Amino acid sequence: MSEMVDLKEFLAELGKTQKELKNVIEQAKDIGLELKTNSKMTPEEANKLYKYIVEGIKEQIQANQPAKNPEQDNKDDLNTAVASKPLNKKVSKTPKKEEKSQPKPKKTKEKKKEAPTPIAKKKGGIEIVNTFENQTPPVENNPKVVSHSQIEKAKQKLQEIQKSREALNKLTQSNANNAKKEISEVKKQEQEIKRHENIKRRTGFRVIKRNDEVENESENSVTESKKPTQSAAAIFEDIKKEWQEKDKQEAKKAKKPSKPKATPTAKNNKSHKIDFSDARDFKGNDIYDDETDEILLFDLHEQDNFNKEEEEKEIRQNINDRVRVQRKNPWMNESGIKRQSKKKRAFRNDNSQKVIQSAIAIPEEVRVYEFAQKANLNLADVIKTLFNLGLMVTKNDFLDKDSIEILAEEFHLEISVQNTLEEFEVEEVLEGVKKERPPVVTIMGHVDHGKTSLLDKIRDKRVAHTEAGGITQHIGAYMVEKNGKWVSFIDTPGHEAFSQMRNRGAQVTDIAVIVIAADDGVKQQTIEALEHAKAANVPVIFAMNKMDKPNVNPDKLKAECAELGYNPVDWGGEHEFIPVSAKTGDGIDNLLETILIQADIMELKAIEEGSARAVVLEGSVEKGRGAVATVIVQSGTLSVGDSFFAETAFGKVRTMTDDQGKSIQNLKPSMVALITGLSEVPPAGSVLIGVENDSIARLQAQKRATYLRQKALSKSTKVSFDELSEMVANKELKNIPVVIKADTQGSLEAIKNSLLELNNEEVAIQVIHSGVGGITENDLSLVSSSDHAVILGFNIRPTGNVKNKAKEYNVSIKTYTVIYALIEEMRSLLLGLMSPIIEEEHTGQAEVRETFNIPKVGTIAGCVVSDGVIARGIKARLIRDGVVVHTGEILSLKRFKDDVKEVSKGYECGIMLDNYNEIKVGDVFETYKEIHKKRTL
């Protein structure tokens, strides 16, 4: 007798709950099976009820159904399966998968001892058993129509299957004893598996497949040697190990702070996802081996849907991540809300660590936002740091070298400051043969010590007489030939206003000749010239001029130079002291020979091939020729027709003239000439670079002009807290707006620097505009709105139209030919605007001996003059116990009853102050006068 199936076990295999028990009982009534809550049923009844619930195949159960022939059962099952097969199941070409047969009762009994497994489908020796709890019955589909030929083929196949079953029964009987012993072990393993399935379960089917018996006897003998129960136990063991590995992985994941996922057992849904590969990890197992007794078949259709859901979920996650990155919205973060400040702080720290690893190349003058970009810093942090340091800047302001170093220290950066001019200059050609070049000699010294006169004597010219005031106010360059060798001389001004000119001359020179008057000695500009030469690291030769005068003392001059660290050769030093006379010409040849010897020692050489590189010594505007510049070539060759640029000026060389007024075609290293063809007057000291064509020259000049314009705008807006407070406090600050026009760039620069040095806390000169050339109407319009504006012209004269416009605008134009006069007049103008210095002069002192209160008059103090003279109307301080209690004027002074103008020391007098009566005995009167003195600049 077969073992009865309990209704509760049946519900567990169907995946039904106790709440759905009534539905199952009603469905059992539909097929003629009366059930109650604790009822039991036979395996045949359970099989038919399972078919009806799961597949919708309705088979009526009769009350005392007689036993049927197995062959007849197989035929009936086949007909039923063919007639009721759902439309969604495709009919296979092989009759093995179309027919259904019922296993022998003995095997079924053994299986029921393991677990209640109602039979769902039977296909040619294959039993499909539902082993999952959450399985829902599929929707019943309309049956397909099957042809008679297919039925006949199925019947033939059924006979073959019957033969296989007979052989299988023999094998089962022989192994029955061994199977009973292993059933208990299999049950324990199955219970362990069910425990894991209750934790994590996916919908699916477990298909128990019996091996088909091979038609030939040799294959049948091999099949008989197999033990199905042993194969099942091995599979259970593998599954157990896999679940243990899964538990370990889940335990590791549980340690991470992630959202806990709900297990399928916690849900009472009627529909569930089917996930075989992820839940049981069957991908790595060969479960489709024909020799195994128990395999799993997957519902691939459901798996595809699951994969699509996973792909859609991944796509949505990617879109959310992209939106979150673009918007930087913390609410888009699915992992939870995080503080935005923490992200910024971590990001900034990472950048700082990257920056520290290598040095950053920063231009010498860089804008604030450019510094932030190069240093990979936040612009707001840079501006905030400068603000805390007392510097108010915007992102477009330029930073000087000191500010860059401060920022580098604040942000712990390693920087290397680069020269700003390097990107605008063309690299010097290194290839080529270096040839000997003439020495460049700069003549420097104090004003009126005879520098230009000495050079005139060397050149046999008289340039000093052509200079206004007999002093040099422009830098001059000349070429002199001596013994077949050329020497280039640069004459620099000696006046203190031309310090920049002397500095430029020292930068381009090879040898410096310091001219000192033997009758005057070392002066201030002499020391300055020596400092320029020392900074340029060039050898110095001293020329002791005016040796023709009587009572000169060259030893005194040498001693003064020795105190400065320049010892003569005849005193054991390194410097040559040559006595010369610019008036008589004595010592000129000796001076030239000394210069040539020094040049031979230095071995001066330069490359003549390639693009020219020259230095602008002076620039001016000449009538008929436009902007001109005096240049000295350092390397390469400058020829007529060459394109060039110098700072903001560019052009093509039209003509070149030497110091003798002769036209030349080529200018080689150490040669000087006056060139024309410039777009504007280049700044003195700028570097002239030869380029291939006009386009490159124009582009480089425009880049430099843009840079300088932005730099000027930045400097005009940049102000510190200290300067701002001074501007607020000094509301009475007086400015004199001026426009400066000069004939040359060097003179213009000297005038500007000299005037700016006159500025002080009370008055200042504001240079609105400066330029080289004549005074124009545009210059007048710049200062027409100011009451005290002045236009200063140096070595230029205004035209008739300009004079008329100046009268119309009420603008003062002043012209000068000597820089002394210009600076002194501007100094006097500033002094007139400044308030005088007030000094006090003590005049007398008197002690109060008695006080008299007179009605309608006031208090009169009876005093004795102890020092000086007390005068009427003079200012006095009333001192009590060493503290000044009142300051005012003496309104009345009497000697007894008479009014007097003053009282001398030792006499008594009566003193009454203006509007003050709180005088007490013992007070002291101290009188004084205020003296106004003019300030000096």
Curated annotation (Swiss-Prot):
Gene3D superfamilies found in the cross-reference section: P-loop containing nucleotide triphosphate hydrolases, Translation factors, Translation initiation factor IF- 2, domain 3
Region G2, residue ranges: 470-474
Biased composition (Basic and acidic residues): 179-196, 237-252
Keywords assigned: Cytoplasm, GTP-binding, Initiation factor, Nucleotide-binding, Protein biosynthesis
Sites where the protein binds GTP: 445-452, 491-495, 545-548
Main location: cytoplasm
Record flagged with keyword Cytoplasm: yes
GO CC terms in record: cytosol
Molecular function terms from GO: GTP binding; GTPase activity; translation initiation factor activity
G4: annotated span: 545-548
Region (G1): 445-452
Localization: Cytoplasm
Domain tr-type G: start-end pairs: 436-605
Transmembrane found in the keyword field: no
Region (G5): 581-583
Residue segments, region Disordered: 61-156, 171-274
Location of the region described as G3 in the Swiss-Prot/TrEMBL record: 491-494
Family label: Belongs to the TRAFAC class translation factor GTPase superfamily. Classic translation factor GTPase family. IF-2 subfamily.
Name the UniProt record assigns to this protein: Translation initiation factor IF-2
UniProt organism field: Helicobacter pylori (strain G27)
